Amino acid sequence: MRLWLVRHGETEANVAGLYSGHAPTPLTEKGIGQAKTLHTLLRHAPFDRVLCSELERARHTARLVLEGRDVPQHILPELNEMYFGDWEMRHHRDLTHEDAESYAAWCTDWQNAVPTNGEGFQAFTRRVERFISRLDAFSDCQNLLIVSHQGVLSLLIARLLTMPAASLWHFRVEQGCWSAIDICEGFATLKVLNSRAVWRPE
């Protein structure tokens, strides 16, 4: 099985430097262009199904990538970005004085501290691991397109490679690119990371 990984295109929150987990934030014109470019790069990729975050920025990206193709789609909450609670659509400069104690605790110990009324890294990790455990349900598929978010995709790569969850930072998943992980007999191999090349059958 191959997992094709695509991060949503650039959003208005990305440009503004805001924390955007579950809060709606539309794709910018650049983000739309990134998704359309991926449509061209992956035109010949033989997707059996697409698994997508519930969030509109990911769903919009998926629609653009797959425009003109009839690929069955599954919307999965496990693929949603980490939820930042009261910090959603806020800038870190504001949080340093508006929620100073909690934000300082999170910056010091991001693996265990929890954003105010949000989702901690441990809960986020368990959610992504639930998604991994569900991959067996798609064992009839050879090629799954996964459209999600940087946090989810970086963590997904780390855990599939049996690395600690905190290793996600080693795998920055860029916008406008595609990545691929091959899974054979339960063993995952990272084959492509952040490619801007046209995929062609080998």
UniProtKB/Swiss-Prot annotation:
Reaction catalysed by this enzyme: adenosylcob(III)alamin 5'-phosphate + H2O = adenosylcob(III)alamin + phosphate; alpha-ribazole 5'-phosphate + H2O = alpha-ribazole + phosphate
Physiological role: Catalyzes the conversion of adenosylcobalamin 5'-phosphate to adenosylcobalamin (vitamin B12); involved in the assembly of the nucleotide loop of cobalamin. Also catalyzes the hydrolysis of the phospho group from alpha-ribazole 5'-phosphate to form alpha-ribazole.
PROSITE patterns xref list: PG_MUTASE (PS00175)
Active site: H8 (tele-phosphohistidine intermediate), E81 (proton donor/acceptor)
Subunit structure: Monomer.
MF annotations from Gene Ontology: alpha-ribazole phosphatase activity; phosphatase activity
GO biological process: cobalamin biosynthetic process
Pathway: Nucleoside biosynthesis; alpha-ribazole biosynthesis; alpha-ribazole from 5,6-dimethylbenzimidazole: step 2/2
The enzyme's E.C. designation: 3.1.3.73
Protein name, entry field: Adenosylcobalamin/alpha-ribazole phosphatase
Organism: Salmonella typhimurium (strain LT2 / SGSC1412 / ATCC 700720)
UniProt keyword annotations, A-Z: Cobalamin biosynthesis, Hydrolase
Cellular component, GO, one term: cytoplasm
Record flagged with keyword tRNA-binding: no
InterPro entries: His_Pase_superF_clade-1, His_PPase_superfam, PG/BPGM_mutase_AS, Phosphoglycerate_Mutase, Ribazole_CobC
Family: Belongs to the phosphoglycerate mutase family.
Keyword Hydrolase listed: yes
Lineage top rank: taxon: Bacteria
